[in-house]
């Protein structure tokens, strides 16, 4: 890499939910019955100095409960590209929904990074409401609380620095404490949006995903994503199958599974 503090970014697809329609992915969907599958990802951010993981995904047990399909558990994909889960120094948790914080105990030596607002939300009075706690798994939340008590959680309030060239930024709406990650690469500043925009169309057409706490905040967060990135083409959504079509695979063996996000798009 030309810059010692530029990073390689890898999107690791570990699962999918094929049986979805547009009504599942957009508020007030126009063609509500048309198929609209989503993929499940975790992301690796690495250079010669460090390896950082964004989100931890979920396991086969959770997949069975939720009717999702898992091809590989995230740590299996990490191992496939030579990354030992125990060697990861930092894990950024975008938010505490089941598909982003479900295998926390697989990373025994990592420091976890979370927004204050997300922990408050996931452990506070909002969880008295069935509709708000639906995307959470209480066991995952309790695991994070235990990590707080063991000194392994760094809390951020709004903007925060993880390492040179890697920062987090609050983008609430889908969840109260959702954060995105801004990463320096040789092609510019890439923003890993996670669920701040599930699909490209959510933010490009400003049409929020229907699991939402605050629609106004979601719309403001779309603007924030674009402001943080070098261009809107540098914003990477959290669940869009198009990501694997718009970026090249790490190598021929990982086609459709592990793709690079720090290089120019293919479209």
Predicted regions and their residues:
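Short glycine-enriched, charge-decorated loop/helix-capping segments at active-site entrances
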Residues: 27-31, 62-69, 128-131, 206-211
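Zn-dependent metallo-beta-lactamase
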Residues: 1-53, 58-60, 224, 249, ...
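Active-site metal-binding loops of divalent metal-dependent hydrolases
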Residues: 14-15, 56-59, 96, 117-118, ...
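Cap/insert and terminal regions of metallo-dependent hydrolase folds
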Residues: 68, 72, 76, 180-182, ...
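Active-site metal-binding motif and surrounding structural segment of the metallo-beta-lactamase
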Residues: 68-114
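Histidine-centered catalytic micro-motifs
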Residues: 91-101, 171-178, 236-242
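Core dinuclear metal-dependent hydrolase active-site scaffold
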Residues: 11, 42-46, 52, 157-186
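Metallo-beta-lactamase
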Residues: 2, 72-83, 87, 117-170, ...
């Amino acid at each position: 890499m030309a810059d010692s503090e530029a990073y390689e970014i890898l999107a690791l697809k570990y699962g999918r939910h094929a049986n979805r329609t547009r009504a599942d992915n957009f508020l007030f969907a126009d063609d509500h019955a048309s198929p609209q599958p989503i993929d499940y990802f975790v992301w690796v951010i690495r250079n010669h100095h460090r390896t950082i993981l964004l989100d931890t995904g979920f396991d086969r047990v959770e997949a069975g409960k939720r009717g999702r399909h898992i091809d590989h558990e995230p740590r299996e994909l990490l191992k496939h590209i030579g990354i030992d889960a125990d060697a990861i120094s930092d894990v950024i948790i975008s938010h505490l929904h089941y598909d982003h914080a479900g295998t926390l105990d697989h990373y025994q030596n990592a420091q976890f990074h979370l927004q204050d607002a997300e922990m408050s939300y996931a452990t506070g009075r909002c969880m008295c409401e069935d509709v708000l706690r639906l995307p959470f798994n209480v066991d995952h939340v309790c695991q994070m609380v235990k990590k707080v008590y063991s000194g392994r959680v760094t809390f951020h309030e709004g903007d925060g620095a993880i390492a040179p060239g890697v920062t987090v930024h609050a983008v609430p709406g889908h969840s109260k404490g959702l954060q995105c990650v801004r990463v320096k690469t040789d092609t510019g500043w890439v923003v890993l949006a996670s669920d701040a925009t599930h699909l490209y169309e959510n933010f490009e057409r400003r049409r929020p995903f229907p699991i939402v706490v605050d629609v106004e905040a979601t719309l403001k967060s779309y603007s924030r994503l674009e402001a943080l990135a070098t261009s809107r083409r540098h914003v990477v959504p959290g669940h869009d199958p198009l990501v694997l079509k718009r970026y090249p695979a790490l190598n021929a063996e990982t086609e459709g599974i592990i793709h690079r996000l720090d290089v120019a798009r293919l479209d």
